[in-house]
Swiss-Prot record:
It holds the Pfam family Ribosomal_L16. Signal peptide: none annotated. Belongs to the universal ribosomal protein uL16 family. The lineage of its organism: Bacteria, Bacillati, Mycoplasmatota, Mycoplasmoidales, Mycoplasmoidaceae. PROSITE patterns: RIBOSOMAL_L16_1 (PS00586), RIBOSOMAL_L16_2 (PS00701). Part of the 50S ribosomal subunit. This is Large ribosomal subunit protein uL16. GO terms for cellular component: cytosolic large ribosomal subunit.
């Protein structure tokens, strides 16, 4: 699963996923991409299961890009522990995905196969999504 090699702080403040993305709202590398239509935190397990779902549909010639990374740790206190006495320990890693963020991209396979791969990956993610085709600017 994805997680950072090292971080500046073990327990960051919660980062909001409200609002629209800045700069990651277009298909940059592949031909098709999957775009979040609402924001959410996506944990590393969901990203990994979506990656596996895409890679099973790609074959040998297909190419995939993961455009999100779980940089932020989420903390949790143990069960049956009273309130107070500090913040809990880091439990898992999440990527902050805002509305309009391109999460995965694929290329080098037939169009129907790309749509099928991204649709299967989208069902693994805890956000509402849509497919986006690359726009060629001439």
């Amino acid at each position: 699963m994805l997680q950072p090699k090292r971080t500046k702080y073990r327990k960051p403040h919660n980062v909001s996923y409200e609002g629209h993305t800045k700069g990651n709202g277009y298909v940059a590398f592949g031909e098709y991409g999957i775009v979040a239509t609402k924001g959410n935190w996506i944990d590393a397990r969901a990203i990994e299961s979506a990656r596996v779902a895409i890679s099973k549909c790609l074959g040998k010639t297909g190419k995939m890009w993961i455009r999100i990374f779980p940089h932020m740790s989420k903390t949790k206190k143990p069960l049956e522990v009273r309130m107070g006495s500090g913040k809990g320990n880091p439990e898992f890693w999440v990527a902050v995905v805002k509305k309009g963020t391109v999460m995965f991209e694929v290329a080098n396979i037939p169009e129907q196969q790309m749509i099928k791969a991204l649709t299967r990956a989208g069902h693994k993610l805890p956000v509402t999504w849509k497919l986006m085709k690359r726009e060629e600017n001439s």
